[in-house]
């Protein structure tokens, strides 16, 4: 996707 996952709250 064009939006990096870092923008959201990573739940790893």
Curated annotation (Swiss-Prot):
Predominant subcellular localization, coarse grouping: secreted
Which sequence positions carry the modification called Leucine amide?
A: 12
Tell me the GO BP annotations in alphabetical order: neuropeptide signaling pathway
GO CC terms in record:
extracellular region
**Where is the protein found, in the record's own terms?**
Secreted
Keywords, in A-Z order: Amidation, Neuropeptide, Secreted
Function as written in the Swiss-Prot or TrEMBL entry: Mediates visceral muscle contractile activity (myotropic activity).
Give the similarity note: Belongs to the pyrokinin family.
What is the name of the protein in this document?
Answer: Locustamyotropin-1
Source organism (scientific name): Locusta migratoria (Migratory locust)
């Amino acid at each position: 996707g064009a939006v990096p996952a870092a923008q959201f709250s990573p739940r790893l």
